[in-house]
Amino acid sequence: METSSLETLPHLPALRRGRPYDSLEKTEIVDHSTGKVVAVVSQVNAGILKKDLQRIDEGRAALRKFTVAELIEISAKAGELFLNGTLPLGDRGHTQSADEYVRTLSGTSGLPHVMVRRNMAKIHYALTHVGTVL
């Protein structure tokens, strides 16, 4: 695929210490039936992970700014948005609805839509019941 057309596709950056990171190392995500590239994902190697783990206390400090109840509420809201909302997709201004997520994941993984929806329901349940799990 041409570079210019790759630049219009959704790009999912790696996250480093809570911030998007546009890595030089990228993987193209392909629809299994059409062979069409549908997104590009930044990846990081073990060296970068090791470097970031040395600063893990920064992440802990950021989480300590919230109460447990606030984190549970944030998780529940995330679960609702995941199952029912339209969310940002990557760092190039794309968005994706839950139905689009089902079609995309089914197309790139080969899983039937019904299986993707079941897994979405499980993720939703886990996120909206964090308080019960804890």
PLM regions with names:
Residues M1-L134:
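N-terminal Rossmann-like NAD(P)+-binding subdomain of aldehyde/semialdehyde dehydrogenases
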